[in-house]
């Protein structure tokens, strides 16, 4: 079937976190979910499950593992065992559990910044010391990794590197040679790797996602990979995710940390949606990726032509645009407050992603094009005043 992503869907009365927190005259483009209807096979599967009417405790059918293993093999040529999969209610719970499983209180954790705020908070949540390495921004907005700085930041007590790939908020899809260099440094310094790869299916311009655990067996042995259908198929409110942990001892430590804190099974509707999405959601994904790529190109062209002083490097993955507003001569130097007040457009504050995000905002372009253009027009008009 053909999906209509231009359709305007009113989410205001649906307890949407994105739409509920702002006044009705504000266009919200912050929180990373889509303003699109999810795949029809997912909706159909949920409808059938709801009509059954019984919502007791669930378990995983063998078909689930078959579908998930086939998905990983098809998309990433990644062959794993069913035993390596651990079901979770979300990736945030996953990387907090990974911190507990991989390091003891007082240990160090390494991150590349700017970075998704819950990842920045994770070390403090579990008594670890966070060490941030700033990604290097080129004149055109493109970010690269300073590998010398990365290695120099490793301390004797550092135990974990927390990777975000595709990277939120900058939109980099790290190439194989970059991942190999990071992994080599981690192995040389005896670091485990926690990889948040939740945006792995949202890719543009023939970029290819390489799960870091697929590099070789030694890397896989020290890695916890976290994935979810939530970004890919717009299922964030259903809380369904999974970890892939090849090392049995590490997997047991991870499972032990969730005991009686994080349930071993996702909710029954989340499980139903996840199975249907990975089994039958490919056509929807193909179509939404084309729409998102067009939206990304719209934002890129608009920024260059109509938002003076704003720099955007087109994201290689994710549906998030990281806008550098430091040269836009915004009064007070706070683009988040400025666009909210003057343009009535809500974006993510770059400072939430760390001190490296000062003067930046993050814009979510996973919405109907007419809404996106409306927001950009408002931002243009605010800058011209």
Residue ranges and their predicted role:
Residues 2-90, 97:
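N-terminal small-domain helix-loop-helix segment of the aminotransferase-like
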Residues 44, 221-293, 301-302:
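Conserved core segment of the aminotransferase class I/II
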Residues 101-123:
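Conserved PLP-anchoring active-site segment centered on the Schiff-base-forming lysine
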Residues 126, 188-189, 219, 343:
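Helix C-cap/helix->beta junction micro-motif
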Residues 137-207:
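Active-site phosphate-binding strand-loop segment of PLP-dependent enzymes
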Residues 275, 291-300, 312-325:
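Conserved glycine-rich beta-strand-loop-beta hairpin in the small C-terminal domain of fold type I
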Residues 329-331, 338-347, 353-385:
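PLP-dependent enzyme catalytic core of the Aspartate aminotransferase-like
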